[in-house]
Amino acid sequence: MRYENLLVEIGTEELPPKALGKLAQAFADNLQGALDTAELKYTSIKWFASPRRLAVNVIGLAEQQEDKLIEKKGPAVSVAFDESGQATKAAQGWARSNGITVEQAERLTTDKGEWLLFKGEAKGEQVSSLLPAMIDGALKKLPIPKAMRWGSSSIQFIRPVHTVTMLFGADVIEGNILGIDSDRVINGHRFHGEKQFSLSHADDYLAQLEAHYVLADFSARKDKIRHQVNAAAQKEDAVADMNEDLLDEVTALVEWPVALTASFDDSFLEVPKEALIYTMKDDQKYFPLIDQNGQLKSRFVFVTNIESKDPMQIISGNEKVIRPRLADAEFFFNTDKKTTLESRLESLKTVLFQKQLGTLYEKSQRISELAGTIANMLSSDISQASRAGLLSKTDLMTNMVMEFPDVQGVMGMHYAKHDGEHDKVALALNEQYMPRFAGDQLPTSNISCAVAIADKIDTLVGIFGIGQVPKGDKDPFALRRAAIGVLRISVEMKLPLDLTTLVQASINSFGTKLTHVEDLESQVIDFILGRFRAWYQDQHIDIDVIQAVAARRPTKPADFAARIEAVSAFKSLASGLALASANKRVANILAKNKVTDTNSINSSLFESEHEAALADAMSDIEETVNAFVVDANYQGVFTELATLHDKVDAFFDNVMVMAEDENVRNNRLALLSKLRTLFLLVADISILNQQQ
C-alpha cells in the first residue's frame, strides 16, 4: 500500500476575515469525516488559510481503501428451492444481484435453520476516484451564511473560485470542483512575486508559497504578527492593546504581514481613550499603544500586506485615514458634553425597548426602582443606586454612542463625571453591562452591582412576562447571558440577595404590561438557577452534586454556591457516599410510607439499642446543625452529620423498619424522617451517584 501526503487548495478572491478560521477548520473537519466514513487510512490532518485560499493537508493518506471480505445472507434454504429441488425466483434474484448462480452460493447453518450465503471480496477504491466527491461534499457543508454566484455559472460559494489544486504526493488528482478543473497551479501574493506558479509536490506547499510572499499557515502568520506588533510596541516603550479576536481578524486580512508604527495628533488624547481605541481597533484594525502608566499614546501599530520600498508612504496613508475618524470622535465628544445626561431622559421616550414592554425611558424607571431596592438589601446608598439606574440608558442618545455603539456605558461614565454626578453613579453607568462575556470582569462596587443586576432582572422578567422564552439557539435578548451575569455577580461578590425578592419586585414594577404572569416568578427563577448547571460543569463539578443542591431549590445564588462547595467536599469523605446511599434508602422507604409528624418520636417504643443510639446522636447535633444552617456554614453541617455514619449503618443492620406493630413501625419511620430532614437542610444527598 502506497501512502502519500495530500494537498487540497481552493484559491478564491478575498474571503471574509472574521469567518476565515472557522471556514478552514470546518473544511478540514468535513473532509476528515468523509475520509473516516470511507475508511481511508491517514496519519493526521491540518488546515491552512489566508485571505485568498482555503487548504487542507492530509498526512500519510493511503492510495486506496483496503479490500474487504463481505458476506451476504440470502433466503432460507426452505424457500430457496421448490419441492422438486429447483431454485425459486427469490433465490435466483438474490444470486443474480450478487453476481453468482444459486449453485455457487455457500450455506450458512445455525440453530435456527439454513440459509444461502454469498462470500466475496470488495476491492478498495482508489483515493483518486473518491476524493473529488469528498472535497465537493466537504465544501458544500461549510457554514456559509450567504453564498454568491459569479460569471454566468449557477455555482455558488462564499467567494468566486479561481483555482483548485489537488495533489496526492506529486500526482494531480483530476476532478472538477466548483466549476474549476483541478491542477497544480497556485496563486501567489497579489502584489509580490509571480502571480501564479506550479506546485510540483504536496510537501512543497508551505515553502513554495513562502517563497512567493504568502504565509499560508494561519497559526504561524498569527504568531509572526503578534511578535512584530509586540516588537514595535517595545520600541515605543509601550504595550500593544491586542486581543485574540483582533489578532485573528488581522491575520485573516494579510498574507505577508509587515507591522509599521504610525501616529496621530496629541490633541485627540483629550477624547476618552475608549472611543479612540474603539475607532482604531474596530474600525481600522489597528493596535493602539498603551504607556507604562496605562495611558493611551498618540501612536499605533498597523499591519500591512506588502513589504514596501517606501514604508513612510504607507504610514502617511494610514495616518490620513485615521485622522478624520478621530476628528469625528472628538467632535461627538465635545458636542455631547453640551447636554447633560439628565436632560436626555425625555428623549428615551422615543426609543422602544420592546413593543409590549415600552420605551427605554420606562425601562430606566424600572431599573432605578429595582436598583434602589437592591442597594437597600446591600446596605448601600439607595439614592446613588436609584440615580445610576435612572441615567443608565441616557448615553444611548449621545452622538458618540450612536456612531460607536460599543462604547455605550463607558461614555455614560465620562459624561456623568463631566456633569458632576457622584463618582459611584458614574462608575455604575459603565459597569452596568458587566459581565459582558464569559470570564469578563465584574462590577466593583455595590452600587454598580445593584444597577447591573436590576437591568438584567428587568430584561429577564419582561421578556419571560410576554411569553418570549428562549428556545434552542434562539435568544435574541441574550437572556442566558443575563442570567449568568446575575449569578456571577451574586456569587463572586458574595451578595446576600434572594432571587424571589428581586423577581417579585420586578414583576410588580411592570404593572399591567406583562401578559404571561402565571407561574412567572417560578419560571424566571428556575431559568436563572438552571444556568448554574453549565457554569459548574465548566468548573468540573460533578453533575450529581449540582442536582443534589438544585433539588432543594435555594433561591439565593451565593447560598446555592456555598451548598455546592459543601456537598462536593462531603462527597469526597469516606463516609459521604455511604451516607448518601443510606439517604437514598431512607427516601425510598419514606416515599412509600408517609410520616405526618417527625416530632412524634417516642423513646419508650424503641426495641433496639440502635434506635436509641441514632435518636440520641441526632438530638446531640440538632441544635448545632440548625445554627450552622442559619450561618450558611454548610460544611460545618456535613461535618456534624458525618458523625451519624456508624449509627445509621448499625440501625439498618440491626433494625427492621417495617415492624408488625404499627406504633413501633410509625415510630421508626418518624426517626428516619427526622434523619432525612436533617440532611435536606443542605441538599438531597440521596441523589449523589454511588458509582463515583
Swiss-Prot record:
It is an enzyme of class 6 (ligase). The keyword Ligase applies. SMART domains: DALR_1. It is found in: Cytoplasm. InterPro entries: DALR_anticod-bd, Gly-tRNA-synth_bsu, Gly-tRNA-synth_heterodimer, tRNAsynth_Ia_anticodon-bd. PROSITE patterns: AA_TRNA_LIGASE_II_GLYAB (PS50861). Transmembrane segments: none annotated. GO terms for cellular component: cytosol. Its EC number is 6.1.1.14. Pfam families: DALR_1, tRNA_synt_2f. Signal peptide: none annotated. It catalyses: tRNA(Gly) + glycine + ATP = glycyl-tRNA(Gly) + AMP + diphosphate. GO terms for molecular function: arginine-tRNA ligase activity; ATP binding; glycine-tRNA ligase activity. Its main location: cytoplasm. One of its GO terms (biological process) is glycyl-tRNA aminoacylation. Keywords: Aminoacyl-tRNA synthetase, ATP-binding, Cytoplasm, Ligase, Nucleotide-binding, Protein biosynthesis. Tetramer of two alpha and two beta subunits. Belongs to the class-II aminoacyl-tRNA synthetase family. This is Glycine--tRNA ligase beta subunit. It comes from Pseudoalteromonas atlantica (strain T6c / ATCC BAA-1087).
